[in-house]
Amino acid sequence: MKEESIIRKGNMQPWTHGKESDIWVSEAIWGHRLKEQPLHALLAEFLNMAEGMLRQGKFLHATEPQQDIQYQARKAKELRVILFHNPTLEQVAEKHNGSNEDAWAQWLKNIQEAARSSHPSDFSYLKDRFPNFRDFLNRVHLIRRSVMNPGNNKKWSHQLLFPMGPSALYVPADDKFGRDRTLFTRSGELVYLMLSRADERLREELAKQLSEKLKGGSQKDNITLGLLPGGQGQFDDANGGTYLPYLSHPAYNRLAEDLLNLANLELPENDVFDVMKHLIAFNLYLYALETSNHWCGTSSPAILVCEVMNTKSDVVRQYSGVCKRDNEDKALKAVENYCEQLIENNQGLCKILADEQQTEDVKVASLDEFLSGELSLKRPPTKITVEDYKKDVMRLAKDACRRNVIPALASLGRIAGLTTKQGTNRLRYAPSDSLIRALVLANVPERVEEVKLLDKLFERYRIVISETHASQILPEQFVESSHYEKNKERFTRRLMALGLATRMSDACTYVKNPYKDAI
C-alpha cells in the first residue's frame, strides 16, 4: 500500500517559539535539530528528556509540532565535581590513611577551593554518609567505571555516566552549569518526540515498559544517589525548543515498535540500553532519509543495499556505496524543493512577482519580507534582482544543510553501525555485529527461517542483502545473482557466529532470539 506523503496539508505545523538559525530551512524539513552527535550522547539525551517527562507525569503523552515541550534536567553539579573535577582524592586518601578526620578535613578544604570559582557547593554532607573516607573513595572509583565513552578528552562537565538509574542522568554543562548544546545537540530529543507521535497503543505500552527503567529507588540508582545532596536545586529551569515538523510519519511507529519489542525481552538492564542506542540511531537515520524522499516527490522508504563484510570488492560493495551517497545527497534536493514550494504556495507573493507593472525593487522587497519571516532570514539588504535573491537564499539554505544535516546523516549511519570504510576508502552500507544483533532482537520474537527474516528486514527497513530483493528494486546492471547469493551466505555465517542462528540437517537456517527462544 502506498504511503501518504508526510508533506500533505494538515500534517505539518510551523514553529512559532523562536528560531535559533540564520536560515530556517533544514529545521523546517527535518526538525530542530538534526546535528552530528556521539552515540552515547544521543542515548543519554533521549533518556534525560524521557526521565524529565516522567517526573512531570507526561511520559510519552501525545505531542504536536507547534508545542514547545519543556522539561527540567538534573544539574548533578556536586556529583560531577566529585567524579571528574577532584584531582586530589587519591592523594588525600594515601596521605591520611588510617585517619578519617584528617582525610575528610583535607579533602573538604581541597574540593571547596576547586569548586569555588564557578560552582560553589557545600560537600560536608558526604562526611555524614561516609564516616570512613576509604568507603567514599571506593564509591567514587565504582561510579567512575560507569563513564560512557571514557578517554574521549571531553571537558569534565561533559562526561556522562551509563544510565544506571535517574540519578546518573544529567545534561552536559557549560562553565556556569547551564545546559551546553555542543554535546546534546537535540537529536536525542527528536527521538523522544518521534515516540510521542506514535500510535496511542504503542505509546502506552512503551511508557509502561520504559517507566520501570527510569524510576529511582533501585540498588544501582542508590549507588549514584549516595553522592548527591538532598533538598532543592537539583534540577535546572525547564527548557524546550526542540521541533519535529510532522504530526505523523512512518518512522514514528517503526521506532516505537522496535523499542517496545526490545523492552519486552528479559534483557539485563545494561544490555537493554546498549542495544537501544543502536536502534534509535538507526531509526533516526531512516527518518531523515525517508523525509528527504518525501520532499523529493516519493513516499517510498530509502533503499539500503548492505554488504555483509567481504574480503574483496564486488557488485554488492559497489552499489552499497552508490546507494549510501544517493540517499544522503537527496537532502540537498529536499532543501531546493522546500524553498521552491514555499514561494509557489504563497499565491499573493506569486501574483506580485508575476506582475510586470511592479518594479524589481518592490518585488525583491515583497520576497524579502516573506522569506525573512518564514525562514528567519538574517540577510543584509542589497540591490539585486528577484532571481539573484532566490539564488542567494538557495545557496544559504544548501550551505546550512551541508554544515549540519549532511554530516549528521554520515554520523548517524556510522554510530548506528550501518556504515563503514573498512577495506575501502569510501563509506558504504555494511552493518556491524552490534546492529545485526539489535535488528534480530527487535524483529525475531520466535524461531524463524532466515529467508523470512530477510523478507522482514526488506519490508520494514528496505534492507537488501539477498538476490531475491535486489532483483525486485535495483537496476539490472547492479544485480549479479552470484554476488548477492554469496552476500546472503556471509550473512548466515555472521548470524551463526553471533549465536543468533543454527543451520539444521535439512540445510535450512533458523534465526533465533536468544532471549525468547532456544533451538
State the predicted function of each range:
Residues 49-56, 89, 114-118, 143-146, ...:
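Surface-exposed polar/charged interaction patches
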Residues 351-519:
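C-terminal structured domains
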Residues 93-266, 270:
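Long, mid-chain structured domain cores
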Residues 1-118:
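Charged, amphipathic alpha-helical stretches
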Residues 177, 196, 237, 242-245, ...:
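Short, charged/polar micro-motifs that form catalytic or ligand-binding hotspots
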Residues 34-37, 41, 98-102, 124, ...:
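Alpha-helix boundary/N-cap detector
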Residues 230-374:
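Long, internal scaffold/assembly segments composed of regular secondary structure
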Residues 42-49, 78, 82, 92, ...:
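Charge-rich, solvent-exposed alpha-helical interaction surfaces
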